[in-house]
């Protein structure tokens, strides 16, 4: 198997686990943690897509940066830039008290935010899964 296809599959699999972790945290009332894992799931799914295009993108963890790269291959990813911006906000604010003036992430990030972040990440994973099928050789 092509090493880029194999790596794509690994990153997409981990993205799906991260999304499940986000859902589990959200159900348990850990909304800050859920938003962080949603952001991670989206970023890993986009890396999976980029591996399909023989790009090894490890220098960024930004969903928007990864979307910008993905758009160079598939214009359809442009529709997810707004979601990417929202998700990227959680990369730090979901974990570090100094990112939230006067509060801590666990007490400030709401259920509404975690539900939306999970939806956005799930949408990004779904488009990557769809595009991945288009890229896979018939023999797989």
Language model feature labels by segment:
Residues 1-140:
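Terminal alpha-helical segments
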